Amino acid sequence: MSLDKIMNEAISPWMKGDGPDSDIVLSSRIRLARNFKQYQFSTMQNEEEAKQIHELFKKKFINKAVGSFGEFGLLKMNELTPLQRRVLVEKHLISPNLAGTEYGACLLSESEHISVMLNEEDHIRIQCLFSGLQLSEALQSANQIDNWIEKEVEYAFDESLGYITSCPTNVGTGLRASVMIHLPGLVLTKRISRIIQVIQKLGLVVRGIYGEGSEALGNIFQVSNQMTLGKSEEDIIADLKSVIQQIIQQEKMARELIVQNSSIELEDKVYRSYGILANSRLIQSAEAANCLSDVRLGIDLGYIKGISRNILTELMVLTQPGILQQYAGGPLGPEERDYRRATLIRERLSIEKN
């Protein structure tokens, strides 16, 4: 696994495929929180204990293959620049919390769809990413990695409670399942607030694109379970999948309603956004995200021909501040970022059209 490859290829291999319901569901993620019995929680550990966990993983798991996942490499946060850490966050390979830790690290698969974060809130957090609605498949992969690690270490586990975690809401299965979902129809019809209220009453959480505390840029929301105690992994997945399928139906109905009642207004909105993307010389990340959302909707509804939906997904990643600066070879001021973002979008759309 090459750090240069990770940094220079903004689109992870797992993002290039189209999973089920990929017109609305961008990705599915499974995260398993685990702690080692012999160490204090990450929030209480000292430097020596953190280094011991690094060495344990370096000895037991680095450059070793498991199943069809290929070999894993280790990235230590204190060996990366702030910009490199930001790129990993923008590619959803690590959490913002891990990026801010001194003794954190990440075990990463060649395909980048599996990462094992070390010394975050818990000793390890296994993350599996799949395109589209593939929660069961992601859980299966996460369990394979979990079993692989558990052969070499002893987890903190209680027979009555389950896996012991730093945060009480993760005690039990330690499972956090989440789905990244694009909901422009519900936003445009002003139904999104009511939908979010219903989701929250069902015990689920709605966040922005980078998880807790982040903003829902480009009409993209992250829906996940909240409690992990008292339910099996399969039940958690089934409940979340059921809710997501209902949201998908609500989004499709909202899109149909807009087409029926406001078709010309929607078409105008889509093409105005396309015009901004295709012609702007300066564009901020929030405006780019909103315009990309409009154009993606236009592609899904058949207004715009000859442009792949995947290009929009690619541009959503490529135009993030960290990745833009990585491509530029170093830090950029806000206006320089806006200029490069606009240039990149124009060039990419021009290539796609031709």
Curated annotation (Swiss-Prot):
E.C. no: 2.7.14.1
Keywords attached to this entry: Allosteric enzyme, ATP-binding, Kinase, Nucleotide-binding, Transferase
CDD domains (alphabetical): bacterial_phosphagen_kinase
GO MF annotation: an example: ATP binding
Phosphagen kinase C-terminal domain location: 24-254
Recorded catalytic activity of this chain's protein: L-arginyl-[protein] + ATP = N(omega)-phospho-L-arginyl-[protein] + ADP + H(+)
Gene3D superfamilies hit by this protein: Glutamine synthetase/guanido kinase, catalytic domain
Location of the motif RDXXRA motif of the pArg binding pocket involved in allosteric regulation: 337-342
EC top class, as a word: transferase
Residues that bind ATP: 27-31, 92, 125, 176-180, 207-212
GO cellular component: extracellular space
SUPFAM superfamilies in the record: Glutamine synthetase/guanido kinase
Family to which the UniProt record says this protein belongs: Belongs to the ATP:guanido phosphotransferase family.
Function in brief: Catalyzes the specific phosphorylation of arginine residues in a large number of proteins. Is part of the bacterial stress response system. Protein arginine phosphorylation has a physiologically important role and is involved in the regulation of many critical cellular processes, such as protein homeostasis, motility, competence, and stringent and stress responses, by regulating gene expression and protein activity.
Protein name: Protein-arginine kinase
Organism listed in the record: Bacillus cereus (strain G9842)
Gene name linked to the record: mcsB
